[in-house]
Amino acid sequence: MSDWNPSLYLHFAAERSRPAVELLARVPLENIEYIADLGCGPGNSTALLHQRWPAARITGIDSSPAMIAEARSALPDCLFVEADIRNWQPEQALDLIFANASLQWLPDHYELFPHLVSLLSPLGVLAVQMPDNWLEPTHVLMREVAWEQNYPDRGREPLAGVHAYYDILSEAGCEVDIWRTTYYHQMPSHQAIIDWVTATGLRPWLQDLTESEQQHFLTRYHQMLEEQYPLQENGQILLAFPRLFIVARRTE
């Protein structure tokens, strides 16, 4: 896959950071020493962690060289490592693992989540936020356009679901706080929706297409978005964006 584009990702920085702020507010920890920010991106979530725990040793993990470079430039006091979340091993047990909009990209959560819990110190916390928009028009239409144009399905799998995550983490020895929130983002145009998803969910669909194929895909996608997302009275578009939140704390 081509590398992530930090500038495009940060075009909606306020909207992307808001769930991280709300997830962080539910983390029941005070004085802690070791934190990992999994899928740290350009460092916007890491900055929130550093602001709350300025004395902690924070390590940001991301597989994108471009994102890691951006994060290092923005936060020289934090450590950033280019690595796969599934394979990275901390040097010590972690008091907090923070994963904002990253774990949805990885498969087999039935193994991944217990593995992450095993990296925590006693009473440590795994805090996770994942987009839960597999059934939203933005993502359904990606699959429909690909089917129409005879391209393979490259979208991510749907999340396991609230009850499944509760059971996974309870069985891993955690107290679990889990909730789901739907945000309604004001978009000035249908093209703005495309700009949003091009930085994230649409990337796998476009990565192997030629420039002309990408344009053909996006033109059709734009047409279908217009059918699914009507304009409000003031000309804005409300983009529904559900997100799943989990705060799991080890009980020993």
From Swiss-Prot:
E.C. designation(s)? 2.1.1.144
Coiled-coil annotated residue ranges, if any: none
**Known catalysed reaction(s)?**
trans-aconitate + S-adenosyl-L-methionine = (E)-3-(methoxycarbonyl)pent-2-enedioate + S-adenosyl-L-homocysteine
Q: Where in the cell is it found?
A: Cytoplasm
State the GO CC annotations: cytoplasm
Q: Which Pfam families match?
A: Methyltransf_25
Matching PANTHER family:
TRANS-ACONITATE 2-METHYLTRANSFERASE, TRANS-ACONITATE 2-METHYLTRANSFERASE-RELATED
Question: What does the UniProt record say this protein does?
Answer: Catalyzes the S-adenosylmethionine monomethyl esterification of trans-aconitate.
Q: Which family does it belong to?
A: Belongs to the methyltransferase superfamily. Tam family.
Q: Which HAMAP family match?
A: Tran_acon_Me_trans (MF_00560)
Q: Which named protein is this?
A: Trans-aconitate 2-methyltransferase
Species this chain originates from = Escherichia coli O6:H1 (strain CFT073 / ATCC 700928 / UPEC)
